Amino acid sequence: GTFVYDCPEPASEPQEILKNMDTPESRTKVLEAEVNSVKEYLASLSNDDLQRPSACVDWSVADVLAHLAGQDHAPRVRRGLQGDYSPEEGSPAVADHDEDQFAKNIFNRALSTREQHGDQLLSYLAQRLDEVVEVFNSVGPNDWDNLCYWPPGPMAVWTLLDQRIAELTMHTWDVRSVL
């Protein structure tokens, strides 16, 4: 037989989508829309849903959501906007970056965030998502290239914005794909 992929027409032309994402300010609107969608989705999750395995190997849905909640994008961007891209207290110097330790820290921070917030994890995540939208909406037109601390090396504010969109999209899929 013949395989036919029936795909509805896109809501807008691909070029229009690209044009709409060509500035950090427009990508901030993408982040805001994604955050609103994710928060609406989170409100539909049950405690049983949170205990299920996610698409991330050895991580439950709650672990993935705790990972998203435990990321420190907003404070790092705030500091970067003030010209400070040095490591926060307790964070390693860029010169001392170890990728294996970085991965372990991500894992441990997710578990710690999950344990710390327990039954309030979803509301904490929603709060953190609102915080990151607020900080990116506060970036002035000449501040997108400001550097922010990132363990492997300083990153521009706009890079952290793109990273946050990618992380949120990817990890939301990790959850939605199994529920």
Sequence positions of predicted segments:
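Short, helix-capping/interhelical loops that line the mouth of catalytic, cofactor-
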Residues: 17-26, 73-138, 142-143
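An N-terminal domain-cap segment
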Residues: 21-67, 75-77
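Amphipathic alpha-helix face/heptad-repeat signature
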Residues: 27-34, 121-128, 160-164
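Amphipathic, well-ordered alpha-helical segments in soluble domains
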Residues: 34-37, 41, 71, 128-131, ...
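Acidic interhelical loop/turn segments
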Residues: 43-54, 130-160
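Short, contiguous alpha-helical
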Residues: 51-97, 149-179
